[in-house]
């Protein structure tokens, strides 16, 4: 057998239980306190999947994020709506066969105001992952170039000329 080095870049498919719970959270059917154990269980399953496969560096599967792009805008003030079709092409609507749900692209990816950190970008994700993983923990962060590409003269110039 040939040994091949692998790393998980970031996102794994979110389990249907997590998707359903996130929908109930957004609609107000459950509280954040009721949602958290479901989210934690999804992270635990993602870590176990990677470790059972022998992957040496593991992520939380980005179970706590709407998308790989949402970590920074969730932690930093100053982002707002911007048309992103020119930069993020393709459909975000998965096939029912893989349990995916239709979803809109993440909001608030464009810079509207000077950026100010509200909380650490990935401290919660990393702290939880490090406590659960026996493998090397890793949290994926979005490249700054994504947000540079989403600079818009219409909405960003006042903050960053």
Predicted regions and their residues:
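Domain-level signal for soluble alpha/beta catalytic cores
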Residues: 1-161
